[in-house]
Swiss-Prot record:
Pfam families: HTH_1, LysR_substrate. This is HTH-type transcriptional regulator CfxR. The gene is cfxR. Trans-acting transcriptional regulator of RuBisCO genes (cfxLS) expression. The keyword DNA-binding applies.
């Protein structure tokens, strides 16, 4: 056995991955219920084993070095395999004693906790953990075996994964209630050709849907402002900075309070699909399989119940 393997411990890898995820020794210590000096000592011991620095500070921000980034990929996979081994042994027990880590695409955070609360009520003994991120993050977590299931929009065709549709995912055009076309019915998208569009960053799910819409309607917006989150876009829409295309499932609160209004553009809502995915090579534990089955059976009904009343006379799920 090499000196590297003799000196390396799973605890060191767990602490390293937690620090990397939070980009903070303090927050990692809080999650792991350790003191900050204990966390720092374990990372220093790991750096001694590796023989290279794993973290550095750039403009006051804790970031991974190149060796640290490489190790993070392997450490995540190792810890994922250990988790799988533990769950495989637990599989001979009861589904109620398992654990699940589910990855949520950012847009789904508006409804997924309430949806999953129904699952945890049925299976109170299951340890459910949630990881949230953008599409790129979820793809990496799936590939690294760091999550069991992923709830996302576009299926992960980049990976050898199993992806199953679970519900409709409508996207709608929204504006301030003070917009001149707020009360217009079934007007053409070209009526918005002079408007400023507030969109997510290129590569995000909602940005991709917007670009498809523009292409299909031979439409070029007068101006596009790129914003980094749905929350920022919603605040900008409320302030009258422009209009946006967003998932209906991000707008429950604002539509109910009247702070944001729907634009009744012909051809909307634009329907996409929610999917639940896992790696083809992954053997789902009884708890994970139970959660997958729950999402397949209940998501469409749940979303229809929660959001169906927000678009009178228009199908949303």
């Amino acid at each position: 056995m090499s000196s590297f393997l003799r000196a390396l411990t799973l605890r060191q890898l767990q602490i390293f991955v937690t620090v990397a995820r939070h980009a903070s020794f303090v927050r990692a210590a809080e999650e792991l219920h350790l003191t900050q000096p204990a966390v720092s000592m374990q990372v220093k011991q790991l750096e001694s084993v590796v023989g290279m620095a794993l973290f550095e500070r750039v403009k006051g921000q804790l970031t991974l070095t190149e060796p640290g980034d490489r190790l993070l990929h392997h450490a995540s996979r190792i810890l994922g395999e250990v988790k799988d081994a533990e769950e495989g042994l637990q599989a001979v027990k009861d589904v109620e004693q398992g654990s699940i880590t589910i990855g949520l695409i950012s847009t789904s955070k508006y409804f997924a906790p309430k949806l999953l609360a129904g699952f945890t009520a049925l299976h109170p003994g299951v340890d459910l953990r949630i990881a949230e991120g953008n599409r790129e993050t979820l793809l990496r977590l799936l590939q690294d075996n760091a999550i069991d299931l992923a709830l996302m929009g576009r299926p992960p065709r980049e990976l050898d994964a199993v992806s199953e549709p679970i519900a409709a995912h409508p996207h709608v055009l929204v504006a301030s209630p003070r917009h001149p076309l707020h009360d217009a019915k079934g007007f053409d998208l070209q009526e918005l050709r002079h408007e400023t569009f507030l969109l997510r960053e290129p590569g995000s799910g909602t940005r991709t849907v917007a670009e498809y819409m523009f292409r299909d309607h031979l439409f070029t917006p007068a101006k596009v402002i790129t914003l980094g989150s749905n929350e920022t876009i919603k605040q900008a829409v409320m302030a009258g900075m422009g209009i946006s295309l967003l998932s209906l499932h991000t707008l429950g609160l604002e539509l109910r309070t009247g702070e944001i209004g729907l634009l009744d553009v012909a051809g909307t809502p634009i329907e996409r699909i929610w999917h639940v995915a896992h790696m083809s090579s992954k053997r789902l534990s009884p708890a994970s399989e139970s959660c997958r089955a729950y999402l397949l059976e209940h998501t469409a009904e749940f979303l229809g119940r929660e959001y169906g009343g927000l678009m009178p006379g228009r199908r949303v799920a």
